[in-house]
A protein has these predicted regions:
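Alpha-helical transmembrane segments and their immediate juxtamembrane cytosolic regions
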Residues: 1-255
Length: 255
């Protein structure tokens, strides 16, 4: 019975975009880890986005007509988004801020698009017919984890793209890997921020939404083409806008 599958890809991505924007606004106006209900609620809503993005990167791998162009497009927007990500988090302090690890050694040195792009590469490795050895594939995937580590959500997002692709069509297995990887990720926060470590598991809120996916991008080809580029462009543009508003003190800050 599939009557409940009422959402196409465009609709789910739009939900993810709204959730992401709410989350990023929360980081901007409620800096740090405040234990207040409003920023916590906003961050819980925002946890919907990452698994949804991983899911659709994996779906894109199976639907794209040219995986090489798809991969290049992902890395191009990873580069563009890196600058927007730094501006959003730190404002504009000079060109040095765009160099990873120049100012600090925090885990998130670039945007989640970097980790998603490497997740796509993981899928390509896993499904490659040119790489015959399972050991070689495992080694390459481990190396990709290291390369993707500096991105937002670390290598967790990359591994989730791989898991969503590997277990495509089996939502319960995808959910298990989601809980496992994010649980490990949240555990790293546990010693100094238990509330926000636990909050990461709100990613499971994405599962009921993904259950409604009908397997289609949308019904209007022209609108689909527009939305494809809208999703790519919105991410860096909204980050840059938040960063500019922060830099010029045009956003209220609640501490």
């Amino acid at each position: 019975m599939t009557n409940y599958k009422v959402l196409n890809g465009n609709a789910i991505k739009f939900i993810a975009i709204v959730a992401m924007t709410i989350d990023h606004v929360a980081w901007a106006i409620f800096p740090g880890y405040p234990h207040k209900w409003l920023p916590i609620a906003m961050h819980i809503i925002g946890r919907i986005t990452m698994p949804t993005m991983c899911f659709f990167v994996a779906e894109g791998f199976f639907h794209t007509r040219d995986v090489n162009k798809y991969t290049m497009r992902m890395f191009l927007f990873a580069i563009i988004s890196h600058f927007a990500f730094e501006i959003e988090w730190y404002g504009f302090r000079g060109w040095h801020e765009f160099i990873p690890y120049y100012y600090n050694y925090d885990g998130s040195q670039t945007s989640v698009i970097w980790t998603l792009a490497w997740g796509l590469v993981m899928l390509r490795v896993a499904y490659s017919e040119k790489i015959k050895s399972c050991w070689a594939k495992t080694l390459l995937i481990c190396l990709i984890c290291v390369v993707s580590f500096p991105g937002d959500w670390s290598c967790v997002a990359s591994l989730l793209v791989l898991s969503f692709g590997t277990y495509r069509g089996c939502l319960w297995k995808q959910t298990l890997w989601l809980v496992f990887y994010v649980g490990v990720f949240g555990y790293t926060f546990l010693p100094y921020e238990p509330l926000y470590a636990t909050l990461q598991l709100s990613v499971v809120l994405s599962i009921p939404i993904l259950m409604l996916y009908n397997g289609q991008r949308g019904s209007n080809p022209k609108f689909n083409a527009f939305m494809k580029w809208f999703f790519y462009l919105y991410y860096p543009l909204h980050l840059a806008l938040i960063g500019v508003l922060k830099t010029y003190h045009l956003l209220p800050i609640y501490r």
